[in-house]
Amino acid sequence: MAFAYDVAVDANSGNNAHAFMLGMVGFNKSVLEVGCAAGHVTKVLAQRGCTVVGLERDPAAARSAATWARRVVVGDVEDVGTWAELGEERYGAVMLGDVLEHLRDPLAALRRAVGHVAPGGMVVISLPNIAHGDVRMALLRGAFPYRETGLLDRTHLRFFTRETMRELCAEAGLVIVDTKRVVMPLFQTELGVIRDDFDQTLIDGILEDPEAETYQFVVQAVVDNGDHAVVALADRLAELSDHVHHEGVRRALLLRDLRERAEMEEEIRWLRRSLEEAEGRYAAILGTKTFRLVAPLRRLYGMMTRPEQPGSRPAPKRP
């Protein structure tokens, strides 16, 4: 049976939200998976020695996920009663993968999730980046193209940037300790934005934002226990992470420019070679005996077909 958001989980991918989240959770943890869907991630967690409890609103999907989970609570994440079924259970990791953007009140749901984090535990969240360059360029064209999945999934109710994601976590009592990014180059998302519709200067301006090609944010956060030293250290780690990301983006853009320049230079070299070959063929034609024999006839033909100059008079006829 096919379910909404059925996906294949590649835990070893270097540019995938599921892989990033699984890497943050690790092995042999107790996990609360909020929005477990049909259990694709649940299965990998179980294979890694994790004990999983899921929350899922779709009963059919929940039954599928139950194959790998210790149990699955069926209900709406925004319903207090759904959380009440968990009792006082706490977990080493609480996962919310592409969940919060679908909620009317993501902050309330996140606060409830934080209440189920065990001491020393973590919260792992993935969110799409509404500030991706393709969304910005679509807006410049007056478009907001909803899709079945992706950045503008038609079921999204809330939208997040890097800053609003951080604000959400802080308001929920979390401190972000690690941030990873799923990267999707401009003009390669499901939105169908076309490069030829935009001036290169505009594109370059958008790319000056290091997050312009960030498709999803994946963050690992811990509960803020009021330890200012921990918060300061987390903030410093976030700054360093951003610096590494920004430097990586800068170098990637530089490499892209160098590659484009190299391609242009190669095209110029090809054109030069083509011109030299054409000149060689033309010189060879000039040197042929046939060309020399017909040269006087070509000159005569040119004189006969030359247009008459303004003001010129025909030569007088001889008596």
Where do the language-model regions lie?
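S-adenosyl-L-methionine-dependent methyltransferase catalytic module, highlighting the catalytic core
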Residues: 7, 15-16, 40, 60-63, ...
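Conserved alpha-helix/loop element of class I SAM-dependent methyltransferases that forms part
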Residues: 12-29
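Class I SAM-dependent methyltransferase "Motif I" SAM/SAH-binding loop
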Residues: 35-37
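Class I SAM-dependent methyltransferase SAM/SAH-binding core
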Residues: 40, 44-81
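A short acidic, Gly/Pro-enriched loop at the edge of an enzyme's catalytic core
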Residues: 83-93
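A short beta-strand submotif of the Rossmann-like class I SAM-dependent methyltransferase core
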Residues: 93-99
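Boundary detector for helix-to-coil junctions that initiate low-complexity/charged tails
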Residues: 224-319
